[in-house]
């Protein structure tokens, strides 16, 4: 029997009462404020998004606080805070003498999708206090609440540790890759290593057809930017198709070949993919295709160099536009990278491919472990916070089972 079972059996063997959210918590609307009327500081301003709208030098909530985003695409998004914050286009919820704020947060988090569903308004959706104030919350004794919070905190901490480890490993890999590909040379170059533009080291730089291609039930796979994964691969598992005749009519520079580099240039720009197999496919205009000059640069080396921090900084500078950032083919052709001899490139490829393999294992293993932990956390959260209603009393699943056993024993 777990500690939680013991507490339930001792403190609430006959069930748990439930009450409306507004009756057991302190719910307050935010205070209107604009950035231009504030001074910059270190206090997060909570508004309609998932991240602070900006930072100011004053606060209107302190201690444990739950916030619910008030408007926009993120309306209804729940967050838990333990630092001073300024609640603006949002509302806050705090616990009282009979309910712990963190317990309340976990219970409401379990209802996140329902809270999203209460959005009202056409152009700019809103979630108001009135949207959820009548939600009924099981209120077990405080020791039971605290034990539930302790268990769920442990699961959340395990997930956070795994996520932090994955982030640290990625940064470590990026550091070594950047160090290997810096060469300690200036942009003007040395005898051994020169900085060259992509236009200089590529036979062609093109993008996909700017006209929507004809679709078919079978034929040649047509990939979009959503088929480019964060692991720098092309995912062919969910693609549309175009007729073979359409593919055959394309210019040769738009037909991917082994050794070509794909590079996303619109929206989620800056993701390179090295084509390692002779696979026929076509792609949308949001993706560029670069054909390296093999006598100057090895495609695998070019692929690694296009992932460095220095190259990404060039991409950020070249990306233009408000709604969707776009890197033009001209700007792409002028972006530079260090090009040593082919012999040096080969040695670097061996090292970087080894790093890549390690990171790929991490990118598969750790995210899978993180996902498993999240599912485990959600399972226990649902189990711990799911209560079966019976008249004016809420019983836990365990209590319902015990009650059924007692009734069976009497028969």
Please place each PLM-identified region on the residue numbering.
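Charged, alpha-helix-forming regions
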Residues: 1-411
């Amino acid at each position: 029997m777990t500690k939680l079972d013991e507490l339930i059996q001792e403190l609430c063997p006959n069930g748990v009462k439930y009450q409306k959210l507004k009756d057991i918590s302190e719910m307050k609307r935010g205070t209107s404020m604009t950035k231009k009327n504030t001074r910059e500081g270190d206090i997060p301003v909570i508004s309609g998004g998932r991240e602070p709208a900006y930072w100011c030098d004053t606060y209107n909530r302190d201690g444990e606080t739950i916030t619910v985003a008030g408007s926009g695409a993120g309306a209804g998004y729940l967050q838990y805070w333990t630092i001073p914050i300024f609640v603006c286009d949002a509302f806050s919820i705090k616990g009282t003498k009979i309910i712990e704020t963190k317990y309340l947060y976990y219970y409401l988090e379990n209802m996140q999708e329902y809270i999203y569903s209460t959005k009202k308004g056409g152009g700019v959706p809103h979630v108001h206090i009135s949207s959820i104030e009548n939600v009924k919350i099981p209120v077990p004794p405080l020791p039971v609440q605290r034990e539930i919070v302790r268990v769920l905190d442990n699961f959340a901490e395990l997930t956070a540790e795994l996520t932090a480890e994955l982030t640290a490993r990625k940064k470590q890999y990026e550091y070594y890759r950047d160090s290997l590909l810096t060469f300690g040379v200036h942009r003007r170059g040395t005898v051994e290593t020169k900085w060259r533009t992509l236009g200089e080291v590529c036979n062609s730089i093109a993008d996909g057809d700017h006209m929507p291609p004809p679709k078919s039930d079978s034929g040649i796979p047509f990939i979009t930017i959503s088929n480019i994964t964060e692991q720098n691969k092309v995912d062919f598992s969910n693609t549309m198709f175009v007729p073979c005749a359409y593919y055959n009519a394309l210019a040769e520079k738009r037909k991917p070949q082994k050794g070509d580099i794909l590079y996303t240039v619109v929206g989620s720009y800056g993701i390179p993919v090295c084509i390692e197999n002779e696979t026929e496919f076509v792609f949308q205009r949001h993706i560029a295709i670069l054909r390296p000059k093999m006598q100057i640069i090895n495609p695998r080396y070019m692929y690694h160099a296009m992932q460095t921090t220095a190259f990404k900084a060039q991409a950020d500078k070249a990306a233009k536009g408000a709604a969707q950032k776009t890197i033009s083919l001209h700007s792409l052709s002028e972006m530079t990278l260090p090009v040593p001899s082919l012999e040096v490139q080969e040695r670097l490829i061996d090292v970087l491919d080894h790093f890549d393999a390690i990171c790929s294992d991490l990118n598969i293993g750790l995210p899978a472990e993180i996902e498993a932990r999240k599912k485990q956390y959600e399972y226990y959260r649902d189990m711990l916070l799911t209560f079966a209603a019976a008249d004016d009393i809420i019983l836990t699943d365990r209590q319902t089972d015990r009650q059924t056993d007692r009734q069976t024993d009497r028969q």
